[in-house]
């Protein structure tokens, strides 16, 4: 029997998988993008906030946008600080529509998208890679052949690690998010504001958030980082902190829950993931492109997908025989900032007793320009924190004078 043949099979239609398939399909390659969920509305698991530059960089349409925001707020147990801009600072993507758009681009450029197909296994035969899927609607097993196989299965890492026992220890995190419909007056108050909550009052050993979506809808979520077994003990369920935000912060009296979803993060400390093996290449969360400090992954997964796409093209053209240069370039791009983020995550989520570090950080940031705060939070330019020390030191000196100057 002759199997259907592709240049590239990509398993997982998240941001990295969808964007990689989109790039390769546009270049004329025959791509199969396979996703185990039968609709993009299932497990709509990303909070999906991103800076405004993401739209132009990745050519994303208005239809993928849930809302724009021009204000950024950080709430701690004791402190509230906001930064604003007269123009939009970023968007919250409609994650389902965003992924559906990427898939439509794949199909529009002559390639295929299969929804409701679960990856089972792969094998080598006659110089080709045979990939086996199970069609979830009827249980039918389908095989295809490919020249390159891409693992975009996220934290599952289903292709790179055949058995669960083969996986190394990962740092892990988990988050849940409610999409709620609120009264117009509540929505209007927070419609343009990206709000993060830090500190033991709002979310011990993690953070929570309120993001605007379409009219009268807000995303309310909470995430927790497990850096060591001590973290897990004596912690309340995440949903407790979501209801805390709804009841105490939003004070919505007649909200309606539209959707609940959640996800897990498995992050390789030191970026020691398997990036490639023979003609198999891994992208997105499969190689920890999500930033561990804040859990943001969409932009970084798409960045990595573009790097992978470049090397896949070279491989198919016979210019390279393996993907080692891909691994090298990924480390060059991510290592430094990700390592700093790891260390900050440990300090914030494990070592920050009574929110001392959190409050001190906000004390630094409050004197900074909005664009500098955006650079720190979204571009990880941590060196800019020093720019806030001027105002911080001035305030400390003034306090000293008041205390001892009579």
PLM ranges: what are they?
Residues 2-16:
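Beta1/beta-strand and adjacent pyrophosphate-binding region of the FAD-binding site
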Residues 16, 39, 156:
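Conserved Rossmann-like nucleotide-cofactor binding loop
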Residues 13, 108-250:
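Predominantly flavin-linked oxidoreductase catalytic cores and closely associated redox partners
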Residues 36-74:
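N-terminal FAD cofactor-binding segment of flavoenzymes
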Residues 85-104, 229-237:
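Short beta-strand to alpha-helix junction loop
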Residues 310-406:
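C-terminal helical "tail/cap" subdomain of flavin- and related membrane-associated enzymes
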């Amino acid at each position: 029997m002759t199997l259907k043949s592709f240049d590239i099979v990509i398993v997982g239609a998240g941001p990295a998988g969808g964007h990689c398939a989109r790039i390769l399909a546009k270049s004329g390659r025959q791509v199969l993008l396979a996703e185990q969920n039968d609709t993009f509305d299932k497990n709509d698991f990303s909070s999906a906030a991103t800076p405004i530059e993401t739209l132009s960089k990745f050519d994303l349409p208005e239809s993928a946008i849930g809302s724009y925001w021009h204000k950024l707020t950080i709430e701690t147990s004791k402190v509230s600080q906001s930064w604003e801009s007269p123009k939009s600072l970023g968007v919250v993507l409609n994650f389902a529509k965003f992924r559906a758009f990427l898939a439509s681009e794949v199909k529009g450029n002559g390639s295929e998208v299969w929804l409701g197909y679960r990856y089972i296994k792969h094998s080598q035969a006659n110089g080709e890679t045979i990939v086996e899927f199970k069609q979830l609607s009827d249980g039918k097993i389908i095989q295809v052949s490919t020249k390159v196989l891409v693992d975009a299965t996220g934290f599952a890492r289903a292709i790179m690690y055949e058995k669960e026992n083969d996986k190394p220890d990962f740092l892990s995190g988990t988050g849940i998010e409610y999409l709620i419909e609120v009264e117009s007056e509540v929505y209007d108050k927070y419609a343009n504001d990206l709000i993060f909550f830090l500190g033991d009052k709002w979310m011990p050993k993690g953070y929570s958030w309120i993001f605007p979506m379409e009219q009268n809808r807000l995303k309310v979520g909470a995430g927790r980082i497990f850096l060591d077994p001590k973290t897990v003990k004596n912690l309340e369920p995440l949903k407790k902190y979501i209801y805390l935000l709804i009841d105490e912060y939003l004070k919505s009296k007649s909200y309606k829950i539209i959707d609940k979803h959640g996800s897990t993060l498995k992050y390789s400390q030191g970026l020691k993931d398997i990036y490639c093996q023979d003609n198999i290449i891994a992208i997105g969360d499969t190689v920890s492109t999500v930033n561990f400090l804040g859990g943001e992954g969409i932009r970084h997964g798409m960045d990595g997908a573009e790097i992978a796409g470049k090397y896949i093209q070279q491989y198919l053209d016979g210019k390279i025989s393996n993907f080692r240069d891909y691994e090298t370039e990924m480390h060059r791009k991510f290592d430094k900032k990700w390592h700093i983020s790891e260390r900050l995550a440990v300090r914030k989520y494990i070592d920050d007793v009574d929110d001392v570090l959190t409050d001190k950080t906000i004390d630094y940031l409050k004197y900074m320009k909005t664009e500098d705060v955006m650079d720190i939070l979204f571009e990880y330019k941590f060196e800019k924190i020093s720019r806030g020390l001027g105002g911080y030191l001035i305030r400390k000196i003034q306090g000293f004078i008041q205390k001892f100057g009579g």
